[in-house]
Amino acid sequence: MISPKDFLRKNLKMIHGYPIIYTFANNWENIEQFHSRPDDIIIATYPKSGTTWVSEIVDMVLNNGDVEKCKRDFITVKVPMLEMAVPGLRTSGIEQLEKNPSPRLVKTHLPIALLPKSFWENNCKMIYLARNAKDVAVSYYHFDLMNNLEPAPGPWEEYLERFMTGNVAYGSWFNHVKSWWKKKEEHPILFLYYEDMKENPKREVQKIARFLEKNLNDEVLDKIIHHTSFEMMKDNPLVNYTHLPSTVMDHSKSSFMRKGIAGDWKNYFTVAQNEKFDVIYKKEMSGTTLQFRTEI
């Protein structure tokens, strides 16, 4: 019998040079050999970049803004996470995906190098949502306080150092966003920014609809924007992850959906931390055309 202590708060495991959550890494062979379908739609992000938000938007776009249809099940069932595997506790992402009808929505945080080859071979459409690194670091820290599948984050100062060096689950934010940005030159990838979606959700939802070849009128777009607002989603038990056991996600430590704003990093970074981060950021992001806004 598997006990939670066998997989909770374990150190990350290296998979092909990338640090991956312990229980996910133990299921690696199944992930690597995953069989995609040509009409699969992949929703990819670095953790804490608005994954659940964009997942619910995509589901609503595909269902023409039908709120009742979108209430059919939990987000973890509608948009399974490819690499999710928690032994004895819940259906794995792959098991859920095998049950889901086409077109399937597939969530992942995997870096380009670890994504199953099948997705490239089938030329699957992909949506990548990127968020500025400073807000990601703060959000990821709070997430790791409550997500017991991750190693304990320790103090914020130490966590930020690990984040800057890529010593967190899924590795370096810098490498993640840069590699997905580059890949869009040769593959159908819609690359979106969290800050743009916050600033002008209608424009960004229209981009998603066009990418998925859906023609939605203003009324439907407005309904989608209302239903997927941070306030609505934070209180929606189908998407706010309160349905997961508290042994896995302890909402008393921090809520899954915490603030959902751009610029919260300013409440956490010291002047010295910010200066050091900026130096590393400039070095890591030199040579890329990627541009991020740290506030809007």
From Swiss-Prot:
An example Gene Ontology biological process: epithelial cell differentiation
Binding site for substrate: 107-109
Protein name as it appears in the record: Sulfotransferase 1B1
Keyword Cytoplasm: yes
Reaction catalyzed: a phenol + 3'-phosphoadenylyl sulfate = an aryl sulfate + adenosine 3',5'-bisphosphate + H(+); 3,3',5-triiodo-L-thyronine + 3'-phosphoadenylyl sulfate = 3,3',5-triiodo-L-thyronine sulfate + adenosine 3',5'-bisphosphate + H(+); 3,3',5'-triiodo-L-thyronine + 3'-phosphoadenylyl sulfate = 3,3',5'-triiodo-L-thyronine sulfate + adenosine 3',5'-bisphosphate + H(+); 3,3'-diiodo-L-thyronine + 3'-phosphoadenylyl sulfate = 3,3'-diiodo-L-thyronine sulfate + adenosine 3',5'-bisphosphate + H(+)
SUPFAM superfamilies hit by this protein: P-loop containing nucleoside triphosphate hydrolases (SSF52540)
Binding-site list for 3'-phosphoadenylyl sulfate: 48-53, 131, 139, 194, 228-233, 258-260
GO MF annotation terms: aryl sulfotransferase activity
Compartment(s): Cytoplasm
Gene that encodes the chain: SULT1B1
Keywords, alphabetical: Cytoplasm, Transferase
Organism in which the protein naturally occurs: Canis lupus familiaris (Dog)
Domain of life: Eukaryota
Other comment: Contrary to other mammalian orthologs the canine SULT1B1 does not shown sulfotransferase activity toward dopamine.
PANTHER family per record: SULFOTRANSFERASE SULT (PTHR11783)
Catalytic class of the enzyme: transferase
